Amino acid sequence: MGREFGNLTRMRHVISYSLSPFEQRAHPHVFTKGIPNVLRRFRESFFRVAPQFVVFYLIYTWGTEEFERSKRKNPAAYENDK
């Protein structure tokens, strides 16, 4: 054993690179590249996703209205009862 945690085994042919936490920036290019990229991705995927949501919303509203209508009694069925 004798090795410290993190260096428990020696791995051959594996190269890893790392930066010191003091050399890294927390959020590089968030405002210059990140937000425009989010807007671009939204525009690209909007017309693929939006029609499905519209169809789902129309079917859902139709289904709830039809359900509420079917719960009511039909007054024409009780006109001749006395």
From Swiss-Prot:
InterPro entries referenced in this protein's UniProt entry, alphabetically: Cyt_bc1_su8, Cyt_bc1_su8_sf
Coiled-coil regions listed: none
Keyword annotations: Acetylation, Electron transport, Membrane, Mitochondrion, Mitochondrion inner membrane, Phosphoprotein, Respiratory chain, Transmembrane, Transmembrane helix, Transport
BP term (GO), one: mitochondrial electron transport, ubiquinol to cytochrome c
Modified residues (N6-succinyllysine): 33
GO cellular component, one term: mitochondrial inner membrane
One matching Pfam family: UcrQ
Protein name, entry field: Cytochrome b-c1 complex subunit 8
The organism of origin for this protein: Pongo abelii
